[in-house]
């Protein structure tokens, strides 16, 4: 055996731990024939001369081990044990297969003869059955069954599908690594050395390991289906060359390092072991571990072979050409060889080593060139946004998922993290299955203190656990508003809700929905509970609701959109329309509990005090009934008295301003004129806040809104006319259904679509006026936009029947047939088949006499180029604006008599009617036609007005069409996600304002039947009509004309509130009203919540919340025309509102209801 440092017995270049002296001294001690000193010297001298030759034959020994005194090498015995075991077993398996094959061939012919004989014997039987098998066959069957049972048992023992199997597999792998570690320790010893089994601790451990390997090998052999292939497996070969040498080592009392390095091949199974332990779950991690384990095991195994041959030498050279290399030097040599660097400091000297290196370079280089780059790529591409969220103590977090893009995230963060929200202590965790691009990543980095991103899917419970969804304050799901298939997008978001609710049913979810009819599917989720904060923001419902309200009060869509969006105040010194518009844009909607100083006061009184004293505009309160169910009452009137713990809804520019309503104290603040000085005083009633009354916040979160304070406000109604009296009920025809079952909307029996279709000539003969024209682009394949959401607010029951504006749809009849199922229960709806681009169709519906023209498109999402998504709407808008008309409105107005409120004389300037929409004397050009156009792409707003100077990069809310209320984009609804999270009643308030009275109960009914159900007029349903509505108050004439010319807005606010219970909240002003020279421009813009001292002009229109008028049950307008006189009368009068006169309520004629019914019957056919 070659020793270290060039000797024959050393291994690894170091001296043996089991030698008492150096090899030369051991050789001298074994020479028993030399006893004299001279002979000893001669012998020593002789041995020194021949040391290189004799050293190769010497085996290092110790005095305690009775080893071969001649130093004979026994490596061949260890190798022979492995070879005999391998080839012997292989020979036995092949011999068994050969004998089995011959037996099968020999018995095949005999089997055919016996089978034919059995068939013949069986056919000769009378009953036709075969004879039973003989006893020998039964014995064979029993033996086969016993063998199969043993085989199945062995298979179960080693299968990873059972706990025992997994334990065995893991244990075998662990012991294999242990045996490899022992090899690493022994590699510092000589390749072959004498050892005593009873005194060598490492040999005993190695022996125990290999006994276990032998037992496991037996189990694998029994369980193997194909013994031959099992015998040739890598793991079997490893056992052949590592297990038998250990037993030989015990027998010979010597050790040979040999092929024990093959245990490194067990590392290939490392990924399987980690999968058994449920550590590796992703494909990338499994692939990475596979590549690493194959690379490392091949590397260590090859290093072990080089270590063996280089320290031993070539056999045909009598082991004289060996060199002392440690195992780790061989590992280094193999690495520089695989990488083709080859420094030359370490190299192979033996022929076997060099021959192995030749073949290893070919395979190793290929493996290095393919495996290493792939490993680096997998490590580099590991989920940068993996890991788990670590919750911060005392800080809430929300999870945002769904449609995560640069646009959606930037819009969300802009509103959620707005500086006006001074109480935001919420961390935002985004979860998406696609890693962010560079722009989105940069956005996250800019908000790194409050934003974190994790890559994953909410459909995966493991990812939900990573973001701590169970401890999250809420989960927000964003929708792709520009997707080609809205129903598919809604289905995806519904699945996300199902997955999240299945993981944690109590989590609060706020999701965006595109289609109104898909909201019904959310009600099927058992844990979905809107009372606990779950909300679905339907973009189609709100978008069309906003547009519908603009049909009643032009510009309202812009005002409402700005109210729930967080906008910073932009100060402009120049006296331009932008100055006043931006001052109103900075106002938002806030909530705050009212001070106890307001207890016992009526709503108008508190509203006036807040506006005059606190500089706050309160528009609604939260009312909780006796059964603790909350309702939001918008401008409820003077019959309601404020109680302790009432929650108010305010329009203000800052959250700090709203706190004045909570801090106000009559004793301390009554004489204060500067509202900024109203702060928390030292009164005991403010210091001793009730625990149930939540801390004042501008955006009260879930529990504060849904859970009632200590006491609830009670409705104290003193007006008997709020609910119809017995005389009214007697005059009602209980068999006529005029309203739906909830009493919130006007209703009629379902009509066939053919009955409402007008030809162009019929439409021209019907002199329509004061109506709403809806230009709709769509075809048979377009996605439905839900026109019901546009019609419902225009059919709210707080309008009298004669006040309803007739709705005329102009568009493809194929598309409208698909929408008609949801529209056939609404009265005063007509359809003109055609196209909005046809001027003939537009003239047929008298578009120049309409109160509003709405332009919608259902084909917006089928175009890849976003700039072309709005091409149809833009073309239609420009087409209408370029039309010219005759001065025909004067003829119509000469035959019409506007509606005069009871007790008012139209001839008196002070008693002029309050108009809903102020009409121009005549419309001769399409530019003056009121139009609202829906846009998908915000940047396309620049094409609507050719005379504006808006920059293409200007934000939508700063553009002139949006400020004037002539354009609306669904993107403005993104702010509702943040607003709803901070205050879930904000969404309820917005929906109450824009949908005309849609409630969760009504949604459940529509989900059940997909249509409104008619109901009889009962006191309960008629009471639902008593709710305020939005209108526009004209200052050109009427009871407020004196304030229109230079008066203060605050005086108008107080007068309207005291006299008519009307709540003013904005101005719709001509764009050039601030100019000293008259202008022909008829464009108007929105001013939200102007200050008290704001100066009015006569042409202003005032946005107001008007009370329901019980005295306006009959239309007094009549408009004669050729064939549809009653229909046209209703159209013209639909644009006229009245102020309720409390002095004349008691003098209402009892026959009013009967006249109402007659008129209803006349127009029912429409």
UniProtKB/Swiss-Prot annotation:
Ethanol and carbon monoxide-bound heme increase channel activation. Heme inhibits channel activation. Phosphorylation of Thr-139 leads to inhibition of channel activity by ethanol. Residues 324-346 dip into the membrane without crossing it. It is found in: Cell membrane. A lipid is attached at residues 106-107, 109 (S-palmitoyl cysteine). Mg(2+) binds at residues 427, 450, 452. The modification Phosphothreonine is found at residues 139, 693, 900. Residues 1-20, 30-51, 689-717, 1116-1166 are annotated as: Disordered. It is a multi-pass membrane protein. GO terms for biological process: adult walking behavior; cell maturation; chemical synaptic transmission; circadian rhythm; eye blink reflex; inner ear auditory receptor cell differentiation; intracellular potassium ion homeostasis; locomotor rhythm. Ca(2+) binds at residues 942, 945, 948, 950. A motif (Calcium bowl) lies at residues 933-955. The modification Phosphoserine is found at residues 695, 708, 712, 908, 912, 1151, 1154. Residues 767-787 are annotated as: Segment S9. Residues 1-15 have a biased composition (Gly residues). GO terms for cellular component: apical plasma membrane; caveola; cytoplasm; endoplasmic reticulum; external side of plasma membrane; extracellular exosome; membrane; plasma membrane. Residues 1150-1166 have a biased composition (Basic and acidic residues). It catalyses: K(+)(in) = K(+)(out). Changing residue 139 to V: Loss of phosphorylation by CaMK2 and, therefore, inhibition of channel activity in response to ethanol. Residues 96-166, 224-227, 274-288, 377-1166 are cytoplasmic. Residues 665-669 are annotated as: Heme-binding motif. Residues 544-564 are annotated as: Segment S7. Residues 1-74, 188-202, 249-252, 310-323, 347-355 are extracellular. The S0 segment is essential for the modulation by the accessory beta subunits KCNMB1, KCNMB2, KCNMB3 and KCNMB4. This is Calcium-activated potassium channel subunit alpha-1.
